[in-house]
């Protein structure tokens, strides 16, 4: 029988996620590898989720905890829209998630989250949340997971204020690509999205491959 502490060491974990604030929206990116100890448990793990028409979120940490939270928040966003006729704002969604996480602080959900969204009044917003509900509103970029030190190296050197989404997409892909080369717990491809005044766009594998080719040509 596995003890509770041993279980926490062995749960499926997501690893590298990135968020960038751009002048016309937000970019989010994740790798696709989930690990359980030294085992690659999933090569197609979903770590990037569309929550609402103008909100998306990345997960790192316990996949089960994060998926449970995603289901709850997605349902709450739909109920909010049905009742009010409006989409939940990124700040409101982040506050709701924070309250849920803080309510479980004695038995915390083992996950780190990045939430990106577009408020039709206040523009693009980027937030990060810790496992007990702490909120940081990011003014530039953020990264989570075991590959984040490498990703931060790329973000620090490449990111400039007031970049457009097109440039932000390339930086995010480059940061994830570098993390996957250096971190054993990151890999197996990239998930990518941007959020702007037109809503959430999730990129296909073919489109992401096109970004990787552009990056490689510049090296």
UniProtKB/Swiss-Prot annotation:
Its main location: cytoplasm. Residues 1-14 form a propeptide. Gene3D superfamilies: Glutamine Phosphoribosylpyrophosphate, subunit 1, domain 1. One of its GO terms (molecular function) is threonine-type endopeptidase activity. One of its GO terms (cellular component) is cytoplasm. The formation of the proteasomal ATPase PAN-20S proteasome complex, via the docking of the C-termini of PAN into the intersubunit pockets in the alpha-rings, triggers opening of the gate for substrate entry. Interconversion between the open-gate and close-gate conformations leads to a dynamic regulation of the 20S proteasome proteolysis activity. It catalyses: Cleavage of peptide bonds with very broad specificity. GO terms for biological process: proteasomal protein catabolic process. Pfam families: Proteasome. The keyword Transit peptide does not apply. Keywords: Autocatalytic cleavage, Cytoplasm, Hydrolase, Protease, Proteasome, Threonine protease, Zymogen. It is found in: Cytoplasm. The keyword Protease applies. Transmembrane segments: none annotated. Its EC number is 3.4.25.1. InterPro entries: Ntn_hydrolases_N (IPR029055), Pept_T1A_Psome_bsu_arc (IPR019983), Pept_T1A_subB (IPR000243), Proteasome_bsu_CS (IPR016050), Proteasome_sua/b (IPR001353), Proteasome_suB-type (IPR023333). The active site is at residue 15. The 20S proteasome core is composed of 14 alpha and 14 beta subunits that assemble into four stacked heptameric rings, resulting in a barrel-shaped structure. The two inner rings, each composed of seven catalytic beta subunits, are sandwiched by two outer rings, each composed of seven alpha subunits. The catalytic chamber with the active sites is on the inside of the barrel. Has a gated structure, the ends of the cylinder being occluded by the N-termini of the alpha-subunits. Is capped at one or both ends by the proteasome regulatory ATPase, PAN. Component of the proteasome core, a large protease complex with broad specificity involved in protein degradation. NCBIfam families: arc_protsome_B. Belongs to the peptidase T1B family. This is Proteasome subunit beta.
């Amino acid at each position: 029988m596995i003890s509770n502490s041993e279980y926490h060491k062995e749960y499926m974990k997501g690893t590298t996620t990135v968020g960038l604030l751009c002048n016309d929206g937000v970019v989010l990116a994740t790798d696709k590898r989930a690990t359980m100890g030294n085992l690659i448990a999933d090569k197609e793990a979903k770590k990037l989720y569309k929550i609402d028409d103008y909100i998306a979120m990345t997960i790192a940490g316990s996949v089960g905890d994060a998926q449970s939270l995603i289901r709850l928040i997605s349902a709450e966003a739909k109920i909010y829209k049905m009742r009010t006729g409006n989409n939940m704002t990124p700040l409101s969604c982040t506050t709701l998630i924070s309250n849920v996480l803080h309510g479980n602080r004695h038995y915390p959900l083992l996950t780190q989250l990045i939430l990106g969204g577009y408020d039709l009044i206040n523009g693009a917003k980027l937030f990060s949340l810790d496992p007990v509900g702490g909120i940081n509103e990011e003014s530039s970029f953020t990264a989570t997971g075991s590959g984040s030190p490498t990703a931060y190296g790329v973000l620090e050197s490449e990111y400039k204020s007031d970049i457009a989404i097109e440039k932000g997409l390339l930086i995010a892909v480059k940061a994830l690509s570098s993390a996957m080369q250096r971190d054993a717990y990151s890999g197996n491809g990239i998930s990518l999205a941007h959020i702007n005044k037109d809503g959430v766009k999730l990129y296909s594998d073919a489109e992401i491959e096109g970004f990787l080719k552009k990056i490689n040509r510049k090296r």
